[in-house]
Amino acid sequence: MIEEAPRIIAHSRFLIAFTGAGVSAESGIPTFRDRGGLWENYRIEEVATPEAFRKDPNLVWSFYKMRMKIMKGAKPNNAHLALAELEKMGILKAVITQNIDNLHREAGNQHIVELHGNIYRVKCTRCDYMENLLESGKLEDFLKEKNLPKCPECASLLRPDVVWFGEPLPQEALQKAFKLAERADVCLVVGTSAQVFPAAYVPYIVKDNGGSVIEINTKESGITPIADVFIRGKAGEVMQSLLVKVKRCLENKKC
């Protein structure tokens, strides 16, 4: 069954990837679960919610600046690079990710839907101001600044442009993801437990429309029962192996 995966990918008409924290684990980015849900003895709910930000924005910004530094030092791993290569080959049409680390973009993917935001983007709590600090070249100065970040247009407090616990997903990104899923005939699920809805509907939409679902995970998940192919393993190792086999499959017309 596992050997079917390269053929399914190679012959796909509209392949999408749905990725989660497992993709970035090999880049050294810790997840909340890795640390037992704690940061500096604070529960994650105390630093990653709207209530926490209203109560103590300094604490929340300390947490997110720490995460920015960690993610800034991380590099795309073999899973990111394989997905970027599949897009370059014209096979992968889009990456729908729950990650905020920007690594898909750094690896070279162009068509990305970020369901949970981007760690390097800030937005105003009052007006429509938004800025990607990495792209604008202001990240280093931002990380050194001791004072709370203020909006350059209205002087209100800036916040990370990420989805906090208890917040809905951005509708524009979610609708874009669903539309891509409706067009897809194959969904490659990589490194996600797919427990958070409505984002986790993505592979179900593909399956309901008669498409195939290929899951790559270190353990079975909520997606496994609907997966046509389940491959157990680390995302980087499996994706690199798959990429080689897909290329071989395309070269061999009988595949």
Curated annotation (Swiss-Prot):
Q: Do the record's keywords include Transmembrane?
A: no
Molecular function GO labels: histone deacetylase activity, NAD-dependent; NAD+ binding; protein-malonyllysine demalonylase activity; protein-succinyllysine desuccinylase activity; zinc ion binding
Domain of life, source organism: Archaea
Tell me the residue numbers annotated for binding Zn(2+): 124, 127, 151, 154
UniProt keyword list: Cytoplasm, Metal-binding, NAD, Transcription, Transcription regulation, Transferase, Zinc
GO terms for cellular component: cytoplasm
Q: Residues that bind substrate, according to the entry? A: 64, 67
Q: What is its EC number?
A: 2.3.1.286
Write down the required cofactor(s).
Zn(2+)
> What CDD domains does the database record attribute to this sequence?
SIRT5_Af1_CobB
- Name of the top EC class for this enzyme: transferase
Q: Where is the Deacetylase sirtuin-type domain?
A: 1-253
Residues annotated as binding NAD(+): 20-39, 98-101, 191-193, 217-219, 235
What does it do?
A: NAD-dependent lysine deacetylase and desuccinylase that specifically removes acetyl and succinyl groups on target proteins. Modulates the activities of several proteins which are inactive in their acylated form. Deacetylates the N-terminal lysine residue of Alba, the major archaeal chromatin protein and that, in turn, increases Alba's DNA binding affinity, thereby repressing transcription.
Q: Which NCBIfam families match?
A: PRK00481.1-3, prot_deacyl_CobB
Concerning PANTHER family, the annotation shows: NAD-DEPENDENT PROTEIN DEACYLASE SIRTUIN-5, MITOCHONDRIAL-RELATED
Q: Please state what the protein is called.
A: NAD-dependent protein deacylase
